[in-house]
Amino acid sequence: VLIAGTLMLSACGPAVQKDQPGFVEGFFGTVVADEPNAAGVGRDILANGGSAGDAAVAMYFALSATLPSAASLGAGGVCLAHKAETRKTEAIVFPAPPAGPARDPRSGFDVATPTAVRGMTLLHVRHGSAPWGTLVAHGERLARDGAPVSRALARDLQAGAALIGQDAAARRIFDKGNGVAVGEGDRWVQRDLGSTLATIRVRGGVDFFQGHFARQLADAVQAAGGGLTLQNLREAVASVVEPIQAPVGSHTAWFAPPPFGGPTTQAAFAGSGGGTGGSYAGGESGFLAVDRRGNAVACTVGMGQLFGARKVTPGTGIMMGAPGGGSNAMMSPMLVSNRHTGDIFLAGTASGGLSAPAALGNVARQTMRERMPLATALAAVNGPQVGMVVCPDGLRQNRTLCQVGADPGGYGLALTAGR
């Protein structure tokens, strides 16, 4: 059962009849992503019994194929992950540091060291249950066989066409013929990226940052004029750290630690931060998953700016990220759980620029503390994209009161697996 937009989970009715392909009986969880194809992948993972961590990993690799302007394999980011059984919440951080300097400062270009694959590898080890290959395969299929260009990617292409048009490899990937870029609804095939994702699927994430593929990637970036080295890839690690936490009655609110934007989200949640407005800038993407056991994962990944370094590494299909730690402050997922039962009460992400962390905190405050309907709170956001699931009585305690929603502009999508 696919449920889009903002709704009460109790309002779900089966869109597919029993005994028909695609029918899902019972509640399996909910997902939100900034791009619809990725949300569909996350929903399918949950419907097949996967965990919230599995769904988040699969959505990231799907996004790498469908929204490379914000979430390519060249990205970095941060996730918050909660286990209901142990009542523990942790932050998995994988900021993308600058790679080495270009060999020729006049003709070369600077890139960030890609860390998102390393981050997803760690997330899967700690919070996954499904086989790694089955999660990566969804993104591989979207790249190899093609997927319809979403409104989200079409918007980014319209804003960034002139920026990426200066790179021959990028022009080739986005060109649908006669120098015209793919647009909304066009089926978009990326064979090089499909091959890269197949390598990650078969050899595991470790090959991307310290194996044979890592060496190939570093060599290809250097041949194109960048400064990425094998040492850069091996040294840019993902880590498990303590998130920021704040008491909310009998609950705990969890925020991403610095250098990410958690402090800004925390301030807005407390009522002392910025508003919900601001222009959309792009370059980041948020996604979240909550499974039927009450486990939750919320992530934000980013490219440093829209389309990152605006360079695609030939032969890999990877849009490289741009260096610059300032973009970390724009990434800020959030969770709220009950410290006695471990039940999840809220999961949220935001993307789209400097105002995104404050927008997330404000929507969380309005829905959880002021009991504003989620649809109303999301409708007031101007610029950033906020995705959220909020359960006033807790997901396991009373999921029928949960609300789930993506931005009302139609760029992202919220889906529920089951009823």
Question: PLM features: residue spans?
Answer:
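Cofactor-centric catalytic regions
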Residues: 385-419
